[in-house]
Amino acid sequence: MVTPLTEPGVFPEVLQVELDCLLQHLGRTTGEATTTVVPAGPVVGTTLPISLTSTTTYEAANGDLLSQKFAGTGQIDVVTLEVEFQGMETFEGGTGRFSDAVGFAHSVGSASFVTNVGFLITKGRLAY
């Protein structure tokens, strides 16, 4: 679920994203991300290039928290409101078994502002 924290279409746009994930080290996981979207250039055709940053807190089933930061690029189709993005995640700290966690991952995903649903594939390493 994506909730705009700023007026839609006004940049930088700040979004609150509720997550429901299946992650290898955490299992079934929920999370909350605050994402900032900034145009990275002019609209070309129907495509707006963007840069994204976010901070996320993942919560494992047992309540342990894992902190993550993301920086990447993407594009928004200004007609369909479909978004594609990619970037790097860094993991650092948390609570419980993740208190000393460090790691990284490359992520590729897509989302729709119409359906309010997104998909993310991430691959990397996490040590804790």
Where are these regions (language model features)?
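Beta-strand-enriched cores of mature, soluble protein domains
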Residues: 1-128
